[in-house]
Swiss-Prot record:
FMN binds at A66, G67, F68, D69, K70, T90, N143, N176, K212, T240, G264, G293, Y314, T315. Pathway: Pyrimidine metabolism; UMP biosynthesis via de novo pathway; orotate from (S)-dihydroorotate (quinone route): step 1/1. It comes from Mycobacterium bovis (strain BCG / Pasteur 1173P2). Belongs to the dihydroorotate dehydrogenase family. Type 2 subfamily. This is Dihydroorotate dehydrogenase (quinone). Gene3D superfamilies: Aldolase class I. It is a peripheral membrane protein. Its EC number is 1.3.5.2. One of its GO terms (biological process) is 'de novo' UMP biosynthetic process. The lineage of its organism: Bacteria, Bacillati, Actinomycetota, Actinomycetes, Mycobacteriales. Pfam families: DHO_dh (PF01180). The gene is pyrD.
Length: 357
């Protein structure tokens, strides 16, 4: 069924298709019996999938990645779609329109996306009001970024303001300094710039705080950020954001689409490399959320055994459809049982722990 729906949706410009899907999801969420039925059909049911990470109970490890539901307008839909949690955003302290359209492109031959959305959102205050009015049944993280018009020198106050507004209402917060679509944002990943931002957000809220990093960092930069996250007692790291690399793409004419971040399978190999390096560096001292190129249960299992406590997807959901999260969760549960693991936590990092020293 979904392959036909996808072919029809792919006839529409990507951002218009996105809005259409959102309208359908909001309609579904508004009808409680339908929402409950979908949750029974698509939601995770095996208790072996549940885990407690940074003090939050997750019914299953695969969540919706930030960027899909930027303003939390479909909060009730994500549990019904089979996700174990959802990350809303990126939101900024002030509303902003993002970059001019067109700004979202399908790379169909690569099952990938290119986006240069630019943090279009209604602002942290609007999201806070929405979160206060409605609490879904799954954990809801919030991804916060810097307002484009805010100068880099005032980034600390900008992130602090967002944390103040949404922190008390989120299951966890993610500090996003890694989108390639806000000028100068990735420069904030340098430790001397990142330290005051993370310290300010940590001081502003008791909610678990994570940092989201780019896949294009050098190994030494990855190590520095991992060490900083441990030093500041962060809850974890989200790895990774989209990549600016165009290596290996097969979709014709991609260079003519202009700048932006690539998500989906072209990112997978680097995302796994980053995850393994981070886990080898920090072990169980931080929770690692792996995102980037996860399409199948095999992909998900590779990330879990490489050190990911939680997973996220966006592009895989677009190409995979409504059963995507369910199929991955069923595959993870099957591998846990077949491998003799008593819990998801036991499997996290198991492949790395077996590596010879």
């Amino acid at each position: 069924m979904y392959p036909l729906v996808r072919r029809l949706l792919f006839l529409i410009p990507p951002e218009h298709a996105h809005k259409l899907v959102f309208a359908v999801l909001r309609g579904v969420a508004a009808v409680a019996p339908v929402c409950r039925l979908l949750r029974r059909l698509l939601g995770p049911t095996d208790p072996v999938l549940a885990s407690t990470v940074f003090g939050v109970r997750f019914p299953a490890p695969l969540g919706l990645a930030a960027g899909f539901d930027k303003d939390g307008t479909a909060l009730s839909s994500w549990g019904a779609m089979g996700f174990g949690y959802a990350e809303i955003g990126t939101v900024t302290a002030h509303p902003q329109p993002g970059n001019p359209a067109p700004r979202l492109f399908r790379l169909a031959d690569d099952r990938a996306l290119l986006n240069r959305m630019g943090f279009n959102n209604h602002g942290a205050r609007a999201l806070a009001i929405r979160l206060a009015r409605h609490r879904p049944e799954i954990p809801i993280g919030v991804n916060i970024g810097k307002t484009k018009k805010t100068p880099a020198g005032d980034a600390v106050n900008d992130y602090r303001a967002s944390a103040r507004m949404v922190g008390p209402l989120a299951s966890y917060l993610v500090v996003n300094v890694s989108s390639p679509n806000t000028p100068g944002l990735r420069d904030l990943q340098a430790v001397e710039s990142l330290r005051p931002i993370l310290s300010a957000v940590r001081a502003e809220t008791s909610t678990p705080v994570l940092v989201k990093i780019a896949p294009d960092l050098s190994d030494s930069d990855l190590d520095d950020i991992a060490d900083l996250a441990v030093e500041l007692d962060l809850a974890g790291i989200v790895a990774t954001n989209t990549t600016v690399s165009r290596d290996g793409l097969t979709t014709p004419g991609v260079d003519r689409l202009g700048p932006g971040g690539i998500s989906g399978p072209p990112l997978a190999q680097r995302a796994v490399q980053v995850l393994r390096r981070l886990y080898d560096r920090v072990g169980d001292r931080l929770a690692l959320i792996s995102v980037g190129g996860i399409e199948t249960a095999d992909d998900a299992w590779e990330r879990i055994t490489a050190g990911a406590s939680l997973l996220q997807g966006y592009t895989g959901f677009i190409y995979g459809g409504e059963r995507w999260a369910k199929d991955i969760h069923e595959g993870i549960a099957r591998r846990l049982h077949d491998g003799g693991f008593g819990s998801l936590h036991e499997a996290v990092g198991s492949a790395r722990r077996r590596q010879p020293s």
